[in-house]
Amino acid sequence: MSYAIIETGGKQLKVQPGRFYDIELLHVDPETSHTIDKVLLVSHDNEVTVGQPFVEGATVEGTILRHFRGRKVIVYKMRPKKKTRKKRGHRQEITRFMVNAINFNGQVIGATENGTTTPTTANVEVATTEGSDSEE
């Protein structure tokens, strides 16, 4: 199992190829590829490479799936005995990022098997049973 720890949006995140992650807003158009070069750690076949602070020559390639807003967080401030109340809401802008491959020193150490980022659906035949119409 190959994985990497990246830094994006001021947070550190463990990523694996073939999975999507919700990260801070990246100002990139949806359905385009994006490369993250702030890789802190790379693990492949029980070999761990730790950067100081970043791993040289390591990148994480992925696709921006969509942008959306997170759940609303309510901030309520009240001063007792002063009749002062403030109610504010905040919704964080989020980007859904699909990890396609982890590159280390020019070679791909982790990638999706089929190379596609959109899930495929299987064709399923629906069997219908014909019943007799009985009138009562």
Swiss-Prot record:
<dbReference type="GO" id="GO:0005840">
    <property type="term" value="C:ribosome"/>
</dbReference>
<dbReference type="InterPro" id="IPR036164">
    <property type="entry name" value="bL21-like_sf"/>
</dbReference>
<dbReference type="Pfam" id="PF00829">
    <property type="entry name" value="Ribosomal_L21p"/>
</dbReference>
<dbReference type="GO" id="GO:0005737">
    <property type="term" value="C:cytoplasm"/>
</dbReference>
<dbReference type="GO" id="GO:0003735">
    <property type="term" value="F:structural constituent of ribosome"/>
</dbReference>
<protein>
    <recommendedName>
        <fullName>Large ribosomal subunit protein bL21</fullName>
    </recommendedName>
</protein>
<keyword id="KW-0694">RNA-binding</keyword>
<dbReference type="GO" id="GO:0006412">
    <property type="term" value="P:translation"/>
</dbReference>
<comment type="similarity">
    <text>Belongs to the bacterial ribosomal protein bL21 family.</text>
</comment>
<comment type="subunit">
    <text>Part of the 50S ribosomal subunit. Contacts protein L20.</text>
</comment>
<keyword id="KW-0689">Ribosomal protein</keyword>
<dbReference type="InterPro" id="IPR028909">
    <property type="entry name" value="bL21-like"/>
</dbReference>
<dbReference type="InterPro" id="IPR001787">
    <property type="entry name" value="Ribosomal_bL21"/>
</dbReference>
<keyword id="KW-0699">rRNA-binding</keyword>
<dbReference type="GO" id="GO:0019843">
    <property type="term" value="F:rRNA binding"/>
</dbReference>
<comment type="function">
    <text>This protein binds to 23S rRNA in the presence of protein L20.</text>
</comment>
<dbReference type="GO" id="GO:1990904">
    <property type="term" value="C:ribonucleoprotein complex"/>
</dbReference>
<keyword id="KW-0687">Ribonucleoprotein</keyword>
<dbReference type="InterPro" id="IPR018258">
    <property type="entry name" value="Ribosomal_bL21_CS"/>
</dbReference>
